[in-house]
């Protein structure tokens, strides 16, 4: 299991070229001062909704106490609904393919003739990738956005020292913990997020960096993810990105090769 997990964690990228997206209408509130969370959350939701599909190629570097692993990956996603990740060999061949949808996940190793599939859950994604995160969180990480917030009334807004950023304190319920997000005041991009579990432990750090506009849409070309309780971190360096160019349904219909052996993980 560990070898498959490490191989797929470095996997998040599928054939993307260029970087074209229909012009993004800059919200009228960008550049203005927010004193309450509601209007800022509305802008972030608008931006998240503006990103429908992504295709990209990226370099993934996974760091664990035992070793560092680096490989190119391909990413294809439909925001909030489906994700396809391919780990690529030095020759560009996919050595592992993950397809995750709202209710199902499948992992195929084309070269070794092995596969695994099952119901969608954060545990299932963790089994394959080593990152026990749900589909919504994975998409938010890969796009540098703030995941949807169920109840905006549970958000508090503070101003960072120096006045260059906002801090959003998001309560996610007594059993779910909370989240703190830092949003740049200049362009309202999500620069970092920290998740805490119900006991107050930091369980996820996300940092977005190297923002560049794609058709007017501010996109982070470097993302760093850390799971401190697992001593595991992942850096994603995008090489090229295409936004809102559409993706084929067939990319999310991963077939099991004839004669493939099912992976039995404990």
Residue ranges and their predicted role:
Residues 1-16:
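Sec-dependent bacterial lipoprotein signal peptides
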Residues 15-70, 264-266:
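N-terminal leader/targeting segments and the immediate start of mature chains
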Residues 59-65, 90-93, 107, 213, ...:
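Hydrophobic lipid-interacting interfaces of membrane-associated proteins
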Residues 151-265:
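Gly/Pro-enriched, hydrophobic low-complexity segments
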Residues 35-41, 53, 109-179, 254-258:
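Flexible, processing/modification-adjacent segments and terminal tails
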Residues 46-54, 66-69, 76-81, 186, ...:
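Edge/loop elements at the starts and ends of beta-strands within beta-rich repeat scaffolds
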Residues 18-20, 81-137:
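An acidic-aromatic
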């Amino acid at each position: 299991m560990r070898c498959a997990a490490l191989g797929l964690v470095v996997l998040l990228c599928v054939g993307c070229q260029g970087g074209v997206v229909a012009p993004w209408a800059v919200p009228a509130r960008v550049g203005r001062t927010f004193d309450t969370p509601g209007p800022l959350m509305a802008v972030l939701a608008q931006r998240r909704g503006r990103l429908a599909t992504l295709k990209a190629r990226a370099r993934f570097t996974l760091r664990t106490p035992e070793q560092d692993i680096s490989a190119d990956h391909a990413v294809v996603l439909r925001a909030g609904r489906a994700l396809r990740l391919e780990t690529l060999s030095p020759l560009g061949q996919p050595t592992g393919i993950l397809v995750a949808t709202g209710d199902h996940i499948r992992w195929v190793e084309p070269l070794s003739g092995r596969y695994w599939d099952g119901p969608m859950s954060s545990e299932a994604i963790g089994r394959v990738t080593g990152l026990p995160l749900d589909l919504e969180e994975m998409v938010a990480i890969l796009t540098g956005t703030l995941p949807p917030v169920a109840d905006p009334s549970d958000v508090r807004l503070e101003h960072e020292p120096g006045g260059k950023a906002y801090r959003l304190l998001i309560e996610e319920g007594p059993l779910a913990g909370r989240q703190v997000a830092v949003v740049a005041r200049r362009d309202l991009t999500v620069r970092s997020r920290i998740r805490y579990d119900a006991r107050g432990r930091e369980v996820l750090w996300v940092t977005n960096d190297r923002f560049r506009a794609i058709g007017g849409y501010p996109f982070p070309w470097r993302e760093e993810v850390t799971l401190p309780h697992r001593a595991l971190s992942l850096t994603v360096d995008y090489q090229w990105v295409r936004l809102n160019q559409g993706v084929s349904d067939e990319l999310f219909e991963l077939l099991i090769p004839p004669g493939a052996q099912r992976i039995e993980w404990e």
